[in-house]
Swiss-Prot record:
It comes from Homo sapiens. It is a single-pass membrane protein. This is NF-X1-type zinc finger protein NFXL1. Belongs to the NFX1 family. GO terms for molecular function: DNA-binding transcription factor activity, RNA polymerase II-specific; RNA polymerase II transcription regulatory region sequence-specific DNA binding; zinc ion binding. A zinc finger (NF-X1-type) spans 269-287, 322-341, 375-394, 428-447, 455-476, 480-499, 507-526, 674-702, 715-733, 777-796. PROSITE patterns: ZF_RING_2 (PS50089). Residues 67-76 have a biased composition (Polar residues). The modification Phosphoserine is found at residues 50, 65, 106-109.
């Protein structure tokens, strides 16, 4: 059965798509299945309407018996149920639409958050399960790793510091191995490329080409050029382009991490592929203390170094005392004791730390050197003083002459020119050998300025700086050098960068530079409405980061008549509408209002300014909060319908006589149809009127008779709908006879009541059958059905094979091959003579052809021999003609006459 809304829309039966309404005496309008239906109507009548406008059922069988009425009532009940369900769904959809307009934060979001948190907890447990089994459930060492994993799950928690955009699950990323910060793959590739270009543009000119590293944008950890990321890998580096799996940590492969711990201990990480640093090694190893005195005990590999707290006892560097500190790692501390110690020269004694026994005083040695003339001028030192520095061979001041003199005499000058290179580095000293430094160079030379743009003649020792300012751009490529007489190696820019960072809140504090600025190092706390929950994000992300989901309960007072509002979490904006039952006492009936609280319902504002023309943009609809009155009471009260079909619960506000919208179903006077009116009141005028008997308010059947006709009769009953049997059909039928030539007119009742033989007689036209037999003669029978009988008695002529003898026989015997005519002796003699004549003609034709060919051959030979002389006689050949050649025409004509005479004689004799 179709749903009620589908039946209303399309209709069924003969009147589909046709709205019909039959006026009745009491003003009730009947609607067919194709017509419109009022809102709130129950069920659809699965019937059409007759041309007269009276409703009819879709099947005739359901009209004749009480079983049909029962089926109709069952259909109406099911349609009523479908219509009720449709109304319920419609109301639910309307309520959902109103709720979507009214609520800013629905409880479904909180349930979704709880589901997400539960799912996240399962993924975290699966990620850390292999680690927690090693640590007996202790997760204190996993806090830092948990923070990274939680940020990977939270939308907007992971931020690329280069583009200041959130990192999504389906984007290719790269993780720094130093600070474990996450960056977009295109961003970090561009960052590495720009960094290498900026460094290489400076170092290639000064130091030649070399492998330029590039730093991490956050921790400045340097990577080689070969370590520039080119492919997207998971956190552990095992899987390239890891697929997106909602049950795994984003950007992970789901396999065991197996990265080596830092510092390396020989073990590998047991967690599933994860972001952030690996936790400390949870393996158990047997190890001893630092001083090796205590017995080895099992400890975690990450905390395998331990102290037994006993005195160390190792001898210190002083060689006199032992270390008194508790068992410790590394070398022992210097000896803390103090003692009186001499300096290395032994002249002074002082109290000093025992850890530094060697020390120097500030006195000159003063010991007499081996020469006996001078004393040692070194400050307190260890060992012998050495030889006198003035002993042995010494050079003159210009280093050209060598002298062997006692240490008490000074080396004299040699008298030669000094010839030392002056401070200018170009000229040499022209004075004689002298003591002390050479004087400044005073020669005048053509000097170029430092930038190489100007020349000037001036003393060599004076520098020449022009006043031209350098216009080259500094390494920042923003500011000019502006230094006077710059040699080309412009100094780095000393101004502040001052560009606004990607966060749009701060400016770059670095020195002016090329390329992109480093990300803003500041962080900002994004808080919930109550401030109890916060999340720390990079500076600049606070404008696009959603506030964290606070699990605290909202503490705002209720705005409706209830004493307390429904519990819900902390949120921004106004609280969601109250959904508690109203529970106000209704004035009319005294029942409690069960509807949700409607003190602050959102109502679309009407009567606003209407645009005067198409040039004005229509304003958006505005909603205002207002208190609505309580809806009508919906407490169910049992009531019986007008037609006594059912007892249904009605809402309290609608208690009263009602129509159940079913079909009346009472049997009309025709005893064939039922009343198709909607449920209505029936008054009983006669005491014997039964419950199923139609009353004066029911319909009066105005349809034609729709009873089934006899087999073969296609004419409707000429009477209106009536009880009992229909009269016989007297319509004249036009039929073809068996031979399909003549049209006959017969009453319909004779055809429908006749048997096979009678029908054959009625269809016979009493004329000869016009059909041809297979032999070609016409059938001799009267108009008949079926195939014609094959009993042809017509006379046919039959001849012998030479066509000379002719006889007449019956057609059926000839077709049955019962009679045949053979040639006699006369026929054979005539055949023989005819064959002889043909042979003679063929022989004559052959001889004639031979003579013609002989004549052609002789003519050809004559042409080959050429012309003969005139006095020669031509050779003549006499050819004798045969008898046939001489008299052939005469013989042929005589033979023809003889054959004709003979044939005429034979034919005349046979007849």
């Amino acid at each position: 059965m179709e749903a009620s809304w589908r039946q209303v829309a399309g209709g069924r039966g003969r009147s589909r798509g046709r709205a019909t309404a039959a006026p009745s005496g009491n003003g009730v309008h009947l609607r067919g299945a194709g017509g419109g239906r009022e809102k709130g109507s129950v069920g659809a009548v699965p019937s059409g309407t007759s041309p007269g406008g009276v409703a009819t059922t879709a099947a005739a069988g359901s009209r004749h018996s009480p079983a049909g009425s029962q089926a109709l009532q069952t259909t109406a009940a099911s349609e009523l149920m479908s219509q009720k369900k449709f109304e319920e769904i419609k109301k639910a959809n309307q309520a959902a639409a109103r709720k979507l307009v009214e609520e800013q934060f629905s409880s479904s979001s909180e349930e979704g958050d709880e589901d997400f948190e539960g799912k996240q907890g399962k993924i975290l447990a699966n990620t850390f399960i292999t680690y927690t089994t090693q640590t007996d459930g202790d997760t204190r060492e996993l806090e830092r790793t948990k923070q990274y994993v939680n940020e990977a799950f939270q939308a907007g928690a992971m931020t690329c510091l280069i583009c200041i955009a959130s990192v999504k699950r389906n984007q290719a990323v790269w993780s720094c191995s130093g600070c474990f910060c996450i960056f977009h793959m295109p961003c970090i590739q561009k960052w590495a490329k720009d960094s290498q270009f900026l460094v290489s543009s400076v170092t290639d000119d000064d130091f030649g080409k070399k492998d330029c590293p590039w730093p991490c944008p956050k921790c400045r950890f340097e990577y080689k050029r070969s370590e520039t990321p080119s492919r997207y890998y998971c956190y552990c580096g095992k899987v390239e382009d890891p697929p997106l799996d909602p049950w795994l940590v984003p950007h992970s492969c789901g396999q065991v991490c197996e990265r080596e711990f830092k510092p390396p201990c020989g073990h590998k990480c047991l967690l599933l592929c994860h972001p952030g640093p690996c936790p400390p090694c949870p393996k158990m190893v047997t190890t001893t203390c630092y001083c090796k005195k205590a017995k080895p005990i099992p400890r975690r590999c990450s905390a395998k170094e331990w102290s037994c707290q006993l005195p160390c006892g190792q001898k210190l560097l002083c060689g006199q005392h032992k270390c008194e500190n508790p068992c410790h790692a590394g070398s022992c501390q210097p000896c803390p004791r103090v003692s009186r110690q001499k300096c290395v020269c032994g002249k002074k004694v002082a109290e000093r730390s025992c850890a530094s026994p060697l020390w120097h005083c500030d006195q000159v040695c003063g010991k007499t050197l081996p020469c006996g003339n001078h004393t040692c001028e070194q400050v307190c030192h260890v060992g012998a003083c050495g030889e006198c520095p003035r002993s042995g061979k010494r050079f003159c001041p210009c280093q050209k002459s060598k002298f062997s003199l006692p240490c008490t005499e000074d080396v004299p000058t040699c008298g030669d020119s000094c010839d030392k290179v002056l401070e200018c580095g170009i000229h040499r000293c022209s004075q004689r050998c002298h003591r002390g430094p050479c004087e400044t160079c005073r020669q005048e030379v053509e000097k170029h300025c430092r930038c190489g743009k100007h020349t000037k003649r001036m003393p060599c020792h004076k520098p020449y700086l022009c006043e031209t300012k350098c216009v080259k751009m500094r390494d920042c490529q923003k500011h000019q050098c502006r230094r006077k007489c710059c040699p080309g190696n412009c100094p780095p820019c000393d101004q502040n960068c001052g560009r606004t960072l990607g966060c749009r809140n701060h400016k770059c504090p670095s020195v002016c530079h090329r390329g992109s600025c480093y990300p803003c190092p500041e962080t900002v706390d994004v808080k919930c409405n109550c401030g109890n929950t916060k999340v720390t994000v990079p500076c600049g992300r606070e404008r696009t980061t959603r506030p964290p989901k606070c699990k605290e309960q909202c503490s705002r007072p209720p705005t409706c008549h209830h004493t307390s509002q429904e519990k819900h979490r902390c949120h921004f904006g106004s609280c969601p509408p109250c959904h508690q039952p109203c529970q106000k006492v209704l004035e009319k009936c005294g029942h409690l209002c069960p509807a949700p609280c409607h003190d602050q319902a959102l109502i679309k504002q009407t009567g606003r300014h209407q645009p005067t023309g198409p040039w004005e943009q229509p304003s958006e609809p505005a909603f205002i909060q207002t208190a609505l009155p309580c809806p009508p009471c919906q407490v169910p009260i049992p009531m019986e319908c007008l037609g006594k079909h059912e007892v249904s619960p009605l809402p309290c506000h609608a208690v009263g006589p009602y129509s159940c919208k079913r079909v009346c179903g009472r049997i009309l006077d025709c005893q064939n149809h039922t009343c198709m009116k909607e449920c209505h009141k029936v008054t009983k005028t006669d005491g014997c009127t039964g419950k199923n008997k139609a009353g004066p308010e029911c319909l009066h059947c105005e349809e034609g008779c729709s009873k089934s006709r006899p087999l073969g009769c296609l004419h409707p009953c000429i009477l209106r709908c009536h009880p009992g049997e229909c009269p016989p059909c007297v319509q004249m039928l036009r039929i073809k006879c068996h031979c399909k030539i003549t049209s006959l007119y017969v009453e319909c009742r004779k055809i429908t009541t006749a048997d096979v033989n009678e029908k054959n007689l009625l269809s016979c036209c009493k004329n000869q059958c016009p059909k041809e037999l297979p032999c070609g003669h016409r059938c001799k029978e009267m108009c008949h059905p079926g195939e014609c009988p094959f009993n042809c008695n017509q006379k046919v002529k039959l001849r012998c094979p030479c066509k000379r003898i002719k006889k007449e026989l019956q057609c059926n015997k000839v077709r049955e091959n019962q009679v045949s005519i053979e040639c006699d002796t006369t026929c054979k003699e005539m055949k023989r003579k005819a064959s002889e004549i043909k042979e003679a003609e063929a022989k004559a034709a052959l001889e004639e052809e031979k003579r013609r060919q002989q004549a052609e051959l002789e003519a050809f030979e004559n042409r080959l021999k050429g012309r003969r002389k005139k006095n020669r006689k031509r050779d003549e050949v006499a050819v004798e003609l045969s008898l046939w050649q001489k008299h052939k025409y005469y013989l042929i004509s005589v033979c023809g006459v003889v054959v004709v005479v003979f044939a005429w004689y034979i034919t005349h004799d046979v007849n």
